[in-house]
Amino acid sequence: MGKNKQNGESDNKSEKKNQKNGDSSVDKSDKKNQCKEIVLKVYMHCEGCASQVSHCLRGYDGVEHIKTEIGDNKVVVSGKFDDPLKILRRVQKKFSRNAEMISPKHNPKQDQKEPQQKKESAPEIKTAILRMNMHCEGCVHEIKRGIEKIKGIQSVEPDRSKSTVVVRGVMDPPKLVEKIKKKLGKHAELLSQITEKGKDNNKKNNNKKEESDGNKIFSYPPQYSSQHAYPSQIFSDENVHSCSIM
């Protein structure tokens, strides 16, 4: 008897859960099947405009009924559609871009979601030292010109006496060796690589150097100035008050 009671209680619980799940699914389907109504503001100056509006919405995305009011420039659309904005965009695309939604009120801020700005890390500048055989100045020029054409390379410094090439730029040194073999057809061997700091760190170091230097004062030497000396008019004939003896 006890086992039968437990089995009966478990069956009742399962039936209640199924009923709840069924009710929730029915509620969701009812919400989707509910008839909605939206009011659009569309400028219509004649019956032809009204027929164009109703023609572009007829049978679109669950639209069932369309009512146009030319005097008030309103279009009332009712039906079982999911998104009212689709109806508005349909009218803007097919009839007029100046169409607006009166009800339900729409918040444009919800659509204009600002994309998350990803912080771009400063690219790492690397310096790779490669071993390459260079027989003459022509080989040196060809290697330098060929490596400079590779994307991300900033500077190339070949040294014929040591058979080395110092390459600086934003790159992956092992891949650079493969590109040199494919494009130039020359053997290259990676000896060492150095990763430099980003641009931001360089700016900080420069600011520290400027602060340590302090304020500099520059003094300019005096300039040569020549003044024109006018002749004395004390004893001239034009001076009435000059000495008569003189």
Swiss-Prot record:
SUPFAM superfamilies, A to Z: HMA, heavy metal-associated domain
Keywords, sorted A to Z: Lipoprotein, Metal-binding, Methylation, Prenylation, Repeat
Gene3D superfamilies on file: 3.30.70.100
Domain of life: Eukaryota
Region of interest (Disordered), residue spans: 1-31, 96-122, 191-226
Binding site for a metal cation 1: C46, C49
GO molecular-function terms, A-Z: metal ion binding
Positions of a metal cation 2 binding: C136, C139
Domain HMA as annotated: residue spans: 35-99, 125-189
Propeptide span(s): 244-246
Residues linked to a lipid group, S-farnesyl cysteine type: C243
Pfam families with a match to the protein in the record: HMA
Cysteine methyl ester PTM positions: C243
Biased composition (Basic and acidic residues): 108-122, 196-214
InterPro entries assigned to the protein according to its UniProt record, in alphabetical order: HIPP4/7/8/17/18/19, HMA_dom, HMA_dom_sf
Family indicated by similarity: Belongs to the HIPP family.
Function of the molecule: Heavy-metal-binding protein.
UniProt protein name: Heavy metal-associated isoprenylated plant protein 8
Source species taxonomy: Eukaryota, Viridiplantae, Streptophyta, Embryophyta, Tracheophyta
